[in-house]
Amino acid sequence: MVGAAIVRDGRVLAARRTSPPEAAGRWEFPGGKVESGESPGTALVREIREELGCTVEVVAWLPGEVAIGERHTLRVALVRVVEGEPQAREHEHDALRWLAATELGDVDWLEPDRPFLEHVRLG
């Protein structure tokens, strides 16, 4: 699994989940699953286009990865928007927020995303 820490003007984009029920209302770095035969970078660009309707490019992968259950791991990359404007699409997210480093603790992040916050804060 891959997530995008979308950065702009010293802020990072957080997305509030609408599903599944146990994740609804909590915040994450948007992203999703890497399909068979797909590179993590290609998957991340595809997922952001599907979820937020914009095109991004990977700037750098953050260090580390986090286990999600027994079958998946999460990697997060710093990315920047190269075309379009991120928009919440209700099938995945109902709100987006641009957060300064000092505001990262203001939202209820999903657990797998939390270890990456310090890297984003230091960014």
Region roles according to the model:
Residues 1-13, 33:
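Conserved N-terminal beta-strand and adjoining loop/helix that marks the start
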Residues 29-61, 100:
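The catalytic Nudix box helix
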